[in-house]
Amino acid sequence: MKITVIGAGAIGGNLAVKLSAAGHDVQVADARGPEAVRAEVLESGARAVELADAVQGRDVIVLSIPFGVAGQLADLFASVPDETVVIDTSNYYPGML
């Protein structure tokens, strides 16, 4: 499967590593840019991409970002086809809202 993980932190990075090891075509995007993706994630075979390029042509998109910033991605998802699976692993932090 073609999978994008948005968020290169502990959860997103580990998911990218495991999904790559399982043979999936994985790309990772982070709001801080491709350079924010940790070396061990890239060594797994996942590719770092710009956030603007992260959602096109993918079967699955995994959100691994803080809960409070998910709404900032609305424009990014405007052109995502209805059949694309979106999985949200976002974290809620007390005091975030």
Feature locations, PLM:
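NAD(P)+-binding Rossmann beta1-loop-alpha1 motif at the extreme N-terminus of oxidoreductases
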Residues: M1-E43
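Rossmann-like NAD(P)-binding element
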Residues: G45, V49-I87, N91-M96
